[in-house]
């Protein structure tokens, strides 16, 4: 832990020495932005929205062999406590308003993971009259995990890709430049 603190202090010191005086606020804000994103990637609290067999693979990802807790991913039961929702399985027309309601109850910033071919595009039931052809028609999706059902390794990889995406965001810097 001390090594990480020393590395961070050296990185900050080198950034301040290289920055021209008029860009110093942008350097400070971008470093704060990076620190906030680092904290968000290390404490991702998803809400599981398991609708079919993909939810079983999602549960396996939280079990002892893959242990998503070591990545800081701890599932929550309430949408008000979570910052990510994992849609796993076949989304029907009757379930779509419930998904939208749960998504709207989540605080910002919020992220969506679509897990399995049924959640991605309807899957095996694509031509059924009662199936939504992809949950991205209801809510915006950040990461798609393919497969029928996707393996637990694919689930872990999808969560790691979401963490990379969160680490690249520049929310404060975009706000500052407005």
Curated annotation (Swiss-Prot):
Residue positions binding [4Fe-4S] cluster: 53-54, 118, 148
Compartments (UniProt record): Mitochondrion
Highest taxon of source: Eukaryota
Pfam families: Oxidored_q6
Gene Ontology biological process: aerobic respiration; electron transport coupled proton transport; mitochondrial respiratory chain complex I assembly
Listed GO CC annotations: mitochondrion; respiratory chain complex I
Keywords linked to the UniProt accession: 4Fe-4S, Electron transport, Iron, Iron-sulfur, Metal-binding, Mitochondrion, NAD, Oxidoreductase, Respiratory chain, Transit peptide, Transport, Ubiquinone
SUPFAM superfamilies xrefs: HydA/Nqo6-like
Record flagged with keyword Iron-sulfur: yes
GO molecular function: 4 iron, 4 sulfur cluster binding; metal ion binding; NADH dehydrogenase (ubiquinone) activity; quinone binding
Record's keyword annotation contains Endoplasmic reticulum: no
PROSITE patterns: COMPLEX1_20K
Cysteines joined through disulfide linkages: none
Coiled coil: none
InterPro entries found in the cross-reference section: NADH_UbQ_OxRdtase-like_20kDa, NADH_UQ_OxRdtase_20Kd_su
UniProt similarity note: Belongs to the complex I 20 kDa subunit family.
Subunit structure: Complex I is composed of 45 different subunits This is a component of the iron-sulfur (IP) fragment of the enzyme.
Reported function: Core subunit of the mitochondrial membrane respiratory chain NADH dehydrogenase (Complex I) that is believed to belong to the minimal assembly required for catalysis. Complex I functions in the transfer of electrons from NADH to the respiratory chain. The immediate electron acceptor for the enzyme is believed to be ubiquinone.
Protein name, per record: NADH dehydrogenase [ubiquinone] iron-sulfur protein 7, mitochondrial
UniProt source species: Dictyostelium discoideum (Social amoeba)
Organism classification: Eukaryota, Amoebozoa, Evosea, Eumycetozoa, Dictyostelia
Gene name for this UniProt entry: ndufs7
